[in-house]
Structure formats: structure tokens, C-alpha cells
Amino acid sequence: SLVGSEMCIRDRTLITLIKAELYTAVIGDIMDKMGYLHQFLPPHIRPLRDDMLIAGRAMTVLEADVHDNSASGGNNPLLQRSFGLMLEALDDLKEDEVYICSGSSPEYALWGELMSARAMQCKAAGAVVNGYSRDTKGILALDFPCFSYGPYAQDQAPRGKVIDYRVPIEVDGVLVNDGDMLIGDIDGVCVVPRRIEEEVFTRALEKARGERIVLKKIQEGMRARDAFDKFGIM
């Protein structure tokens, strides 16, 4: 639809701007000022490589611990399927979306090389998982942005399944809705709720540009106190 394509163009422009000028610290500062004090994912969710960046819309995925019960009965046919709905979730990724997964115990890998390859075909922006990732050499070779607890090969197949996607999820107390904007860099991952994104990014750009001026002044010899009193930035 025309509306859909206009939104895509607007998102593309916004994402380009975020990657060029913004970073998690300045975006987080603005959300703090606006009273949104719990928008950072926990600090152990880190990029697989320090220079990896993510900016894109959340495609939320709900995982749960499920003992591999394909041989047993049970009342939910979904749980008889390998990986549950993971393959459907992966195939549903759209351009500039981020596969973000939470809900399970942090005891196994929720992302890997083949998932990265498929996500790249969908033109996804990256993956953020509340757990480990594996096939690390392969993911790094693909240069696909992945944020996780780090490398650990123990697989989800006999331990967990995707039970739903494009539903609200929680990552250590941080609510993530499908379509929220996710920004990730070496300092972590922050979640910008869609309803406040316009104000957040407008103010973050202003602050980022101000910070560059303050940096220049400090490098020219200005004292920290004077810089803060004059610019209100530190």
C-alpha cells in the first residue's frame, strides 16, 4: 500500500540518521529526561563484535523452556513441532526489522549462523536475544549484527521453542512491543517506544550536536563546570 511504502521510506530515512549521528547513550539520556527510566536491556546483552550496530524496528519473539516432548502426549500440538514457531517467525522478518527474543532460561543459544543467513535474505537489521548465540565464526563471517550474552553452543532444539511472535515481550523488566525502535551499539541496547520516538529522536539529535560543541570547547581548555553551566551538557 501507499501508506505502507511511505512508512518504509520514513523508517529508512530515520534509521540512516540514527546510524549517522546517534548512539545509545544520548538516546537513553533523552528518555531519562522524559521519565522513561527503564529502557536499556541488561548490560550482559552485548554485540558479538564491538563495532556492530543495530537500528531497526522490533520483531518480537516469545520463547519458552520446553523439554523435547515430540515422543510424548501433551495438549498443545505446537509443542510437538521442532522449534515451535521459530521458523515462521524468522520467515516473517521484514526489511529493517530486528529479531528480538525473550522468555526462556538463559541456558542455551537462541540465534545462530543459518538464522543469520535467512535474516539477511529478509534484509533484517539484526538480532537481539535474551540468551546466548552460537556458530559465532559463521555469524562474524556474515557480518550480521547480533547482540546476545555471548557465544555458547548449547542448542535450543531440545530445550526451548518459540511459542508466539509479534506479541509484547519482556527482557529483564523492559517491555518491548512489536514495532518499537531498537538501537544497539558497544554500550548496549535501548528500546524506544513507538509512541514517543519522534520526540526522543528530535531531542537526541539536538543533544548529540550540542555534545560535539562541548567536546570542542573542553579540548580548547574550557573547565567542566563552566561547560556544564553554559551548555547544560556533560
Positions of PLM-derived features:
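N-terminal low-complexity or amphipathic/hydrophobic leaders
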Residues: 13-79
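Histidine/lysine/aspartate-rich catalytic loop segments that bind and position anionic ligands
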Residues: 134-154
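Short, small-residue-biased leader/transition segments that mark boundaries at the very start
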Residues: 1-9
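Acidic, glycine-rich flexible loop/linker segments
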Residues: 151-227
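A glycine-rich, hydrophobic loop/mini-helix early in the fold
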Residues: 51-111, 116
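Hydrophobic, well-structured mid-protein blocks that either form specific transmembrane helices
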Residues: 105-141
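Structural motif
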Residues: 28, 38-39, 57-60, 97-100, ...
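Buried hydrophobic positions in well-ordered alpha/beta secondary-structure cores of metabolic enzymes
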Residues: 31, 119, 180-182
